[in-house]
Amino acid sequence: MKSDIPQKKTVLRLYNDNFQNYKRYNIPKAQLVIADIPYNIGINAYASSPEWYVKGDNKNGASRKAGKAFFGTDTNFNIAEYFHFCNRLLKKEPKEKGKAPCMIVFCSFQQLNTVIEYARRYGFRNYIPLVFCKNYSAQVLKSNMKIVGATEYGLVLYRDKLPKFRNDGNMVLNWFLWERDGKNIPRIHPTQKPIKLLKQLISIYTDPGDVVIDPCAGSGTTLRAAYELGRSSYGFESVKSFCEAAWERLLPGAMAYRPAEIAEQTSLFVEG
């Protein structure tokens, strides 16, 4: 597979581990933490999608995805623990203007207020809402019943000072086109974000040589986008199958970290 990854002294690492164990890896603090948190939609993940049925046709009956979550950890996400650890992963607030770090969180529309509230509790008092516009919708089965969803949402979260901002003199609007990746980018994760979109966001809030961390890396597209831009990237993904697929198909040359034994840890996902 051809790769656009530059031959620079930047780092690309994906850890098959929970990011709560970040201290064991001695990774540097991040200029940008960017993550797609679980949407907590559980067994309704494919509810309005043709994937609910075999070959997309209800005449064929329900598929194996019917009544299933996107993945095992897409329920009971502990958002308080998430912000507690992300606050530690980011650089401290600098004295200088124009150098502050930030977080970008992808979330559902229903999660926006919750994310804002918990972010404030952990020191991220300011935010900028983001909207991502698609030219398609996953809600195909509802298309003759109602207006269907074709947007994704996110938040730029920061502490006090405005974060580093690299706009090259151009106005940056708070909505972005969501363009799907080409066939050269393998589809590994059900909520995988387009590399082109991730590159836009990373370019706005970081410089070459900065560190980008994705605590819920999934397929690793954030890591690849950052690395191709000359940013060192570190990611954590607890699901082994996603890590294996990312190392093999999406992140050529990545440092693969497979802990032989992962110590007992407090999970971000509440049991019960």
Language-model regions, residue ranges each:
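Class I S-adenosyl-L-methionine-dependent methyltransferase module
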Residues: 110, 251-272
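Conserved SAM-binding loop
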Residues: 246-247
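Core catalytic lobe of class I
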Residues: 1-243
